[in-house]
Design a protein with these regions (language model features):
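Active-site/ligand-binding-proximal alpha/beta "capping" segment
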Residues: 93-128, 135, 186-192
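Short beta->alpha connector loops at strand-helix junctions that form conserved
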Residues: 44, 68, 88-89, 108-110, ...
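Short loop/turn segments at connectors of secondary-structure elements within structured domains
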Residues: 4, 128-130
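A cross-family phosphate/adenosyl-ligand binding-site feature
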Residues: 2-101, 140-179, 184-196
């Protein structure tokens, strides 16, 4: 059975100094979401992959909701052309709002902020607080070290084997979009396995 997907939260870098292959993947993902009329939810940044995925979704006829703390707006770090801009008070509120608005998460490569967002949403799913698909878009094998670390966590019993199904890995934007439709929704009762 296909999941009903109206919105997708995309985590990604704000850096402008990264390889063009990452920008290509971000634009392709934004285009696919826009063409399918899937609302893009992100952190409303006006630089890097965050801006690239937003601009591509908008060009393809999609809608973008950006969620950003007020202090970042005051710094002028927000994208001014989004369909909707939601200002919040803190980084914590930003992440919760993005999760609450989304039917799935796709993580593109990024730095500490992206990695922190991804690991937090994985943790929420482990605890049964987020039940929707989480897809890691492994452009240029960027996430291989993280995936190795997660496998090691399972191997050494810091996580259960069942927790390996919390996330799925895609190599292309097309595969990532297909996975958000086909990945089974998580069962909240899994939280009984949260502790080893």
């Amino acid at each position: 059975m296909m999941n009903k997907i109206n919105s997708v939260c995309v985590y990604c870098a704000s850096s402008t100094k990264i390889d063009s292959v990452y920008f290509g993947a971000a634009r392709e993902l934004g285009t696919l979401l826009g063409q399918r009329q899937i609302r893009l939810i992100n952190g409303a940044g006006n630089m890097g992959l965050m801006s690239a995925v937003s601009d591509a979704a908008l060009r393809a006829g999609g809608e973008v909701t950006g969620v950003i703390p007020r202090f970042m707006v005051e710094q002028g770090w927000h994208h001014t052309g989004l369909t909707q801009l939601v200002e919040v008070e803190s980084m914590h509120e930003r992440k919760k709002t993005m999760a609450d608005l989304s039917d799935a998460v796709i993580a593109l490569p990024g730095g500490c902020g992206t990695l922190e967002e991804l690991l937090e949403i994985i943790t929420w799913k482990q605890l049964g607080l987020y039940l929707n698909p989480i897809v890691i878009l492994n452009v240029k094998n960027y996430f291989d070290p993280l995936l190795d670390m997660l496998r090691q966590a399972v191997d050494e019993n810091f996580m259960r084997v069942q927790h390996g199904a919390i996330w799925h890995v895609a190599q292309t934007p097309q595969e990532a979009v297909e996975l958000i439709y086909t990945t089974p929704l998580w069962d909240a009762s899994i939280r009984k396995f949260a502790a080893i």
